[in-house]
């Protein structure tokens, strides 16, 4: 079975690459992002809109309310194996994402070492200036999405439920927005009414949080198992 894996740090264009590949091959894309399994976090987690999908199919490892918490890496890995098995007779699958814990689960599992032909695209982390430019553009889109709620509207809506607050405080983007509100002595709902200067500071701060996460991803990702640019068989990763 052919598996096309696209992985790398946040804000490096994985999703757009996966969509383009899906258009070329007709294969569905399976997201390897644990936060994207919660539709209530669609914008903040970077779920592409229907328009952005351009007619391609995107699958998720789960579809759960935030009250159930973020799916664990172990559960996500089990779901991943099941999805791959389900698509075995359909010609292949595109795997796309940047979950450190899930990719490390894959690296530690013997399941992936045989019976697959791997095509791997590893997106690299750009220099800080280039990354911040891309990340700020992404955050601006999250604040004013073409469809659905903004990241702040998602936050405000979910913050009303006290038991969801610890979960939100642990997720990039939402975490910094809450910190920004605290530092400026405002409530989360007041983030919807920022002036241009304050909004730019919020955008910069969220982008910096993404940079910190991207650097951690770059350090913690497992190494690709083969140096060949072309497809290969055998373990996809080496620890």
From Swiss-Prot:
A Pfam family matched in the record: IPT
* Organism superkingdom: Bacteria
Enzyme Commission code:
2.5.1.27
Q: Name one GO biological process term.
A: cytokinin biosynthetic process
What is this enzyme's class at the first EC digit? transferase
| InterPro entries per record | P-loop_NTPase, Tzs
| Annotated keywords | Crown gall tumor, Cytokinin biosynthesis, Plasmid, Transferase
Per its record, the protein catalyses: dimethylallyl diphosphate + AMP = N(6)-(dimethylallyl)adenosine 5'-phosphate + diphosphate
Q: What span is annotated as the signal peptide, if there is one?
A: none
Q: Its biological function?
A: Transfers dimethylallyl groups to AMP as part of the biosynthesis of cytokinin phytohormones.
The similarity annotation says: Belongs to the isopentenyl transferase family.
Specify the protein name: Adenylate dimethylallyltransferase
